[in-house]
C-alpha cells in the first residue's frame, strides 16, 4: 500500500497490472500496510480492496488481517479474501511460521527458532523467496490453484528458512541469504 497513496504512482500500478496480466505474469500483492502514510484509514482500506481482487497471490500478515477483514481468524477470512483473481493466500505469522491456502488445499510450516536482530524486510524476503520458487518450478497463474499441500509446505518451509537467516542480520536486502548460504546455514535444513 506504500505506493498506492493517491498519486500518479497508483495509476501507474494499474497500468502495470494490465500489462503484466496481458504478458501472462503471476500477480502478487503484499499490502504492507503503512498507516502513517495515509491520512485516512478508510481510504487505505478501500484502496487495498480495490487492488486485492486483481492479484493471483495475496500475502498478508497476522498484523494486517484484522484491519483488512475485521477478524483475527484467517480461516474465517478466507471466503472474503478469495475474491476476483485471488488463487493463493499466504499468511505470515512471524516467529510462529506461515500458512498457504488455495481454494482446495492448505499448508503450514513452522519458522526455525532463531534470535532476531532486525526484522526489516522479512515480509518482502518471504514473498520474494516464495515467488522465486514458483518461477524456478515454472508455475503459472493457471497452475496456482492446483498446488498440492506437499508443494505448498515445501515452499513455505524454504521461505521461512530464508527469513530466519535474514532476521539474524542487520538490514533488509543486505541480510538476504544466497542459495549457498541457505544450504550451509540450515544444513540439512533442520528445524
Model-identified regions with their sequence ranges:
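Conserved phosphate-binding/catalytic region of the ribokinase-like
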Residues: 18-22, 70-191
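Conserved beta-alpha-beta core of the PfkB/ribokinase-like small-molecule kinase fold
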Residues: 2-80, 96-97
Amino acid at each position: 500500500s506504500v505506493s498506492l497513496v493517491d498519486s500518479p504512482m497508483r495509476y501507474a500500478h494499474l497500468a502495470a497490472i494490465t500489462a503484466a496480466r496481458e504478458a501472462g505474469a503471476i500477480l502478487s500483492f503484499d499490502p504492507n500496510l503503512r498507516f502513517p502514510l495515509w491520512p485516512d484509514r478508510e481510504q487505505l482500506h478501500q484502496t487495498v480492496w480495490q487492488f486485492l481482487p486483481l492479484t493471483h497471490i495475496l500475502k498478508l500478515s497476522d498484523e494486517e488481517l484484522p484491519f483488512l477483514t475485521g477478524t483475527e481468524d484467517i480461516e474465517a477470512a478466507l471466503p472474503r479474501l478469495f475474491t476476483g483473481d485471488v488463487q493463493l493466500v499466504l499468511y505470515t505469522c512471524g516467529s510462529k511460521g506461515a500458512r498457504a491456502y488455495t481454494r482446495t488445499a492448505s499448508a503450514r510450516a513452522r519458522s526455525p527458532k532463531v534470535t532476531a536482530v532486525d526484522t526489516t524486510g522479512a515480509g518482502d524476503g518471504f514473498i520474494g523467496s516464495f515467488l522465486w520458487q514458483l518461477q524456478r518450478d515454472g508455475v503459472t497463474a493457471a497452475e496456482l490453484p492446483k498446488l498440492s499441500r506437499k508443494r505448498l509446505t515445501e515452499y513455505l518451509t524454504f521461505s521461512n528458512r530464508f527469513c530466519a537467516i535474514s532476521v539474524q542480520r542487520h538490514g533488509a536486502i543486505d541480510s538476504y541469504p544466497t542459495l549457498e548460504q541457505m544450504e550451509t546455514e540450515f544444513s540439512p535444513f533442520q528445524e
